[in-house]
Amino acid sequence: LKMLIDVSVTMVNGVFLPQGINEYINDVQHFNSVGDILRNYAFKAKMLTRHAGTHPPGAVMTLWLATRLFTYSDMVKAFLIIFSAPFTLIPMYLLARQLYDKKIATYTLVVYLVTPNIVMYTATCMDAFFSLFLITSTYLFFNSVERKSAVLAVLTGLSISLSMFMTFATTFLGVYFISLTTVTYLGNRKELKSHVTVLAISGGTFCLTYLIMYWV
């Protein structure tokens, strides 16, 4: 159902909003390789389109790889979002089920499918692609706290790192997780140790990931 909605919206937006779909995909031509993107993205930011010039390099790199595997076309971006956006429903359902129950999780999916801004931009805006990493990171954090798992905490850090590589909106997750830990200290100190441990491990993994990228 999600994919059918995305295809329908793409057909409409492809006619009425062609300029929106050109964001990011038009910037692929400015780079010759993945290494070029990693090394020179900041230096070339001023020559990129509005969104690409104010976002991390993840989206352009993803589209660069996609165009090498398939072809250079605006629709490559649309189909990338069409086929990836539905996967957002998986961590969203798991997160809602973990925090509440299966009934609420099902309602969450229904609301997601009929939310106007999500429906209208889900197949032409890269935010639909970014949301997969944001929601997955949130689910992994709560799952790590509940299971008290260091391995899941490391995966949380890696997921946040990947999410930050895609969008600066990931900064909110850090603020949210820190605020949540603070509230836990005030309201439920029995769970404080788990929150602090997961926060430290995931945060450390996040920082280490980018330090390694910088050194390499």
Where are these predicted regions, by residue range?
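Short hydrophobic/aromatic helix or loop-helix immediately within or flanking a transmembrane segment
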Residues: 46-71, 163
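Membrane-interface alpha helices of multi-pass inner-membrane proteins
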Residues: 120, 152-179, 208
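Aromatic-rich transmembrane-lumenal/periplasmic boundary elements in polytopic membrane proteins
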Residues: 1-54, 210-216
